[in-house]
Amino acid sequence: MITAHPAITIRRAVADDEPAIHAMVRRERLNPHHLYFRNFAVAVSGHEIVGASQIRHHRDGSRELGSVVVTPLWRGCGISARLIEFLLAGEGSVVHVITRKRHAHHYERWGFAPIPARLAPCPIRLNFRIGDTIGTIMALVQRRRVNRLMILRRTV
């Protein structure tokens, strides 16, 4: 972890950022679909992308905060919070997030609250079901604790 905090810039992603975003998302084994740079904000230190997050724009109009990722060296410095605040500042509609149950409390400060999956829009419900099923199967195969997912909603 970085203890001295050099300047971190949060900005909208540009096309040249896409390879770094894809690499970070793959490294963390996050949902690899719908990774369009136009939906992303990035955290930059010097010329290095050290964090990224996006709001997915689904065809039905629903919005999903996702792909929140920070490089290991920079974790614990508040970068993910700054990325989320940056993205949510530009959103005037309902936003959902799919997260592990044990991480849900981190989203309360932005007004996210748990909802039953049946109340989520179809694309978000589908992402939730796929992620929860794959995560459960992988945990069982690897003989580790199952970390269940949940859906949170933020209303404006």
Predicted feature residues:
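Short amphipathic alpha-helix that is part of the acyltransferase structural core
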Residues: 1-32, 42-44, 146-156
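Conserved acetyl-CoA-binding loop-helix of GNAT-fold acetyltransferases
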Residues: 70, 76-89
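C-terminal "cap" of GNAT-fold acetyltransferases
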Residues: 121-156
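Conserved beta-strand in the GNAT
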Residues: 42, 48-57, 62-69
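Short, small/polar residue-rich loop motifs at catalytic or cofactor-binding pockets
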Residues: 36-37
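Conserved GNAT acetyl-CoA-binding A-motif
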Residues: 89-102
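Conserved active-site alpha-helix within GNAT-family acetyltransferase domains
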Residues: 101-128
